[in-house]
Amino acid sequence: MMAALDAKMASMGAKPDLAAGHRITQVSIWHVPLTSHETYYMAEGKTCDTVETVVVAVKTDQGMVGWGEVCPIPHYLPAYARGVAPALTEMAPAILGADPVGPEALVARLDAYLPGHIYAKSALDIALWDITGQVAGLPLYALLGGRRQADLPLYHSITCIAPDEMARIARDAQARGMSQFQAKLGADADWQADVERLVKVREAVGPGPIVYGDWNCGATSLDASRVGRAVSHLDIMLEQPCATLDDCARVRASSGLPMKLDELAHDTESLLRAHKLAIMDAVAVKLSKFGGLSAAGRARDLCQYLGAKMCVEDTWGSDIATAAALHLGIATDPARVLNVCDLSGYVAPRVAPTAPVRTNGRISPPEGAGLGIIVDAVALGAPDVVLE
C-alpha cells in the first residue's frame, strides 16, 4: 500500500517522510447523535435538535490515540456528517502508515491526494494535533502560540423564538455570569419581530454586555437593512445577515452598525475580501469551516493582522471540538478574542464528561498533553467504521 502511495505522491512532486518515529495504523469513526437541551431555531427554517457528530480516533504503531470531531449542521455549510467516513476512506491510502506528528505535513499531502472535503479533514487534523501534543508532552495551546490569558469569555446563543422568551433566556444567562449574547433572528421571516427581539434582549441585559443578532445568511438585504436601521440607536452588532458579501456590505452601509461574519468567512480569499468591504469587525473562526486547527490557526493569524475580533469555535459538536477551539482561543491575542463557545454545554451526551465547563461566563482549556481530555470510549461503543 505504502509503495503505491509513494509512487502517487512522487508523481505529484511530494516525497514521504521515511524518518518518522510514529506511524498511523488505524482510524476509527463513530456517528454520535447529539441532542440539544432545547430546540434551536434559526432563519429559513434551519433547526438544531438532534444532529450527528462524527468522532474520529487515530491510533499509532506506538499505541498513542488522538481524537477529533466534526459536527456539520444540516443546511448550514456544504458539509454533512455521513460524508466524513467516505472521504476518510478515500484518503486512507495516504493516511495509513503516515507520520501523525506535525499535522500540516500530512494535511498538505491529503490536499494533494483529495482536494476539498475540508470538513472531513478537520476531524482528522484535530486528532493529529492531539497526537502531536501528546508526543511533545504539551497542551495544544503551547504549540499554537502559547497561553495568552487565564480563561476565555463565552457568549450565550439564544434560539429564535418569541421576543419575550428570548429576553428571559438572556436574563437567566446573565444571572449565571454571561455577558455576551447572540440572538438568532429570522425564523418567522418577520423583520418587525426581529426588531422586537433585538430591542427586548438589549433591554433585558442592560447597557454594557455585547448583543448581536444573527440571521445565518437568511435575510434579504432589504429586510436586514430595515431591522438594522430600526435598532441603529442601540448598542447592537449584526451577524451574517445575507448570503453574499456584497449584500452584507449593503446592510452595513445602510444601518451603520458593526458586523460579524460567519458562513461567508471560510478561507484566506473570503477573509481578505470581507476586510476590504469593511464588514468584518468580528468573524467566526470555526475549525471545520477552514479545515481543522492547522488552517484555522492560519486564519487566526491573518485576522489578528487585519484587526478583526474573533469568535474561536466550531460549527457544532461536543467536548472534542470544544476543547480544540479552546486551545486555539487561549493562544490568540486577547485583544482580538471576542469570545468562544462551549458547544458541549448545549448538547447531550458529553463524549468527554470531565472536560472543562463554563464558570461565571468564562471557560479555560484542558491542561493535559494534547487536547487534554479523556474521551469515554466505553460510552461510544464499537466504531461504525475502522480503517486499517
Residue locations for each model-derived region?
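Metal- or metallocofactor-binding catalytic centers and their adjacent structured scaffolds
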Residues: 26, 59-135
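Short beta-strand elements
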Residues: 54-60, 355-358
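Glycine-rich, aromatic-flanked loop segments that form ligand/cofactor-binding clefts
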Residues: 119-120, 125-159
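Flexible C-terminal active-site loop/helix
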Residues: 2-15, 19-27, 32-36, 48, ...
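Metal-dependent enolase-superfamily TIM-barrel catalytic cores that perform enediolate-based chemistry
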Residues: 142-145, 149-255
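Hydrophobic faces of well-ordered beta-strands that scaffold small-molecule active sites
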Residues: 66-68, 152-158, 181-183, 211-215, ...
